[in-house]
Curated annotation (Swiss-Prot):
NCBIfam families: S15_bact (TIGR00952). Keywords: Ribonucleoprotein, Ribosomal protein, RNA-binding, rRNA-binding. CDD domains: Ribosomal_S15p_S13e. The keyword Ubl conjugation does not apply. Part of the 30S ribosomal subunit. Forms a bridge to the 50S subunit in the 70S ribosome, contacting the 23S rRNA. One of the primary rRNA binding proteins, it binds directly to 16S rRNA where it helps nucleate assembly of the platform of the 30S subunit by binding and bridging several RNA helices of the 16S rRNA. This is Small ribosomal subunit protein uS15. One of its GO terms (biological process) is translation. Transmembrane segments: none annotated. The gene is rpsO. GO terms for cellular component: cytosolic small ribosomal subunit. GO terms for molecular function: rRNA binding; structural constituent of ribosome. It comes from Nostoc punctiforme (strain ATCC 29133 / PCC 73102). Pfam families: Ribosomal_S15 (PF00312).
Length: 89
């Protein structure tokens, strides 16, 4: 379920704000979205894995807080990011 180093590098390069950026809110949201998607697939196959479900809820809460921060900073950046990630319908 953990992200491979190669996949992390792909996500970072796609969402980084500048060349050495590895921890901006955009990158963090993209990483969390990837982890959430993988964990959701796992939970569809393993319905009784309650500890993973709790972890999923924690990840969703963390992503929600980061998205709120991005929304406060720049509404346009927020709209572009959620459209790019395909979240929030």
């Amino acid at each position: 379920m953990a992200l491979t180093q190669l996949r992390k590098q792909e996500i970072i390069s796609n969402y980084q704000v500048h060349e050495t950026d590895t921890g901006s809110a955009d990158v963090q949201v993209a990483m969390l979205t990837e982890r959430i998607n993988r964990l959701s697939e796992h939970l569809q196959a393993n319905k009784k894995d309650h500890s993973s479900r709790r972890g999923l809820l924690k990840l969703i809460g963390q992503r929600k807080r980061l998205l709120a921060y991005i929304s406060q900073e720049s509404r346009e950046k927020y709209q572009a990011l959620i459209a790019r990630l395909g979240i929030r319908g």
